[in-house]
Regions:
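Structural motif corresponding to the early beta-alpha repeats
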Residues: 51, 65-95, 115-119
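Conserved, mostly hydrophobic/aromatic
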Residues: 6, 18, 46, 59, ...
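Beta/alpha (TIM)-barrel catalytic core signal, keyed to glycine-rich beta->alpha loops juxtaposed to Asp/Glu
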Residues: 118-284
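N-terminal binding-site loop/beta-alpha segment at the start of enzyme catalytic domains
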Residues: 1-74, 141
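Active-site mouth loops of central-metabolism enzymes
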Residues: 16-29, 79-95, 121-125, 233-242
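Active-site groove signature of glycoside hydrolases
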Residues: 100-124
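Short, acidic/polar
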Residues: 26-38, 89-106, 152-160, 243-251
């Protein structure tokens, strides 16, 4: 496994990490098997956006006794209500959810605390100028989070956050098809068929500027949607042909400032396919 430094944070992460989607609805036995297999392979980082109490508890149990060897990127602004995930900007919901996160993970700190799903410049301004940012800074000062980050699908919002100097890490959707698309506050457009009805040949300049700015300012990028939610791996891929996991991983990991791809694997076989990147020949 190759390891990279996450921007100026000094945090070393495996270039292949885990997303949390594959843990949802699978039970504690599967969570333990997946975490054990990942750790054995050298994976040392995980993105946890889900507020699902079972997922949080299962991951906490799986990390018992080895928490300090693992990098947790976990999200503020997500809550569990009525058995459903919800994105929120209400402090009366954010604070209890964060306390629940720490308790279920059996830890007293999160390595990277992420502002969740910030897909418009207005949403970023609301966070940057308000109580949520103050809360994150208080958590950082007390050591309960070590670095501050943000997740986004929109290069405009992400660039505003990066240029503000208020975040250390950006989680962004990176793959060879999304990178052709202009920024939008509606992330659904990234995977809508009509967005690819016309042939697009060049990287969107706003995305290119975002990656270069992250590199220059030392903001590390962790990647989501490297496989486009699986769409890029099928014959109906907007790329015009099915790409392989290795090709998608290689694309993401060769963008400026990218340190790790957080892959939401749903099986041990999918994990194995991703890990094949570490030993793949250049021709693959």
């Amino acid at each position: 496994m190759n390891y990279r430094t996450l921007g100026f944070t000094g945090i070393k992460v495996s270039e292949i990490g885990l997303g949390c989607e594959g843990f949802v609805g699978r039970g504690e036995k599967f969570a333990a098997e997946l975490m054990n297999a990942a750790i054995t392979a050298g994976i040392n980082c995980l993105d946890l956006y889900s507020p699902d109490p079972d997922v949080r508890s299962f991951i906490g149990n799986a990390l018992h006794g080895r928490r300090d060897d693992f990098v947790l990127q976990a999200h503020l602004c997500t809550v569990w209500q009525g058995g459903q995930y919800k994105c929120t900007r209400k402090m009366e919901e954010i604070v209890p959810s964060f306390e629940d996160l720490l308790a279920r993970l059996e830890t007293d700190y999160i390595d990277i605390g992420m502002f969740h799903y910030v897909d418009s410049p207005a949403a970023w301004r609301e966070i940057a100028d308000g109580a949520i940012m103050k809360y994150a800074q208080e958590l950082r000062k007390s050591g309960r989070i070590r670095s501050v980050g943000l997740s986004s699908h929109n290069p405009k919002a992400a660039l505003a956050a990066v240029e503000s100097g208020l975040i250390d890490v950006l989680m962004f959707s990176v793959n060879p098809c999304y990178d052709l698309q202009p920024g939008s506050e509606d992330c659904e457009k990234l995977w809508a068929d009509e967005s690819y009805s016309k042939k697009l040949l060049n990287m969107d300049p706003e995305r290119e500027k975002l990656y270069e700015t992250c590199q220059r300012r030392g903001v590390g990028i962790t990647v989501m949607k490297a496989f486009g939610g699986g769409d890029l791996l099928t014959g109906d891929s907007p790329a015009g042909m099915a790409l392989t996991p290795v090709q998608c991983l290689h694309y993401a990991l060769t963008r400026p400032a990218v340190a790790a791809v957080m892959s939401g694997v749903h099986s041990l076989e999918e994990l194995k396919e991703n890990l094949a990147y570490e030993t793949a020949a250049d021709a693959e």
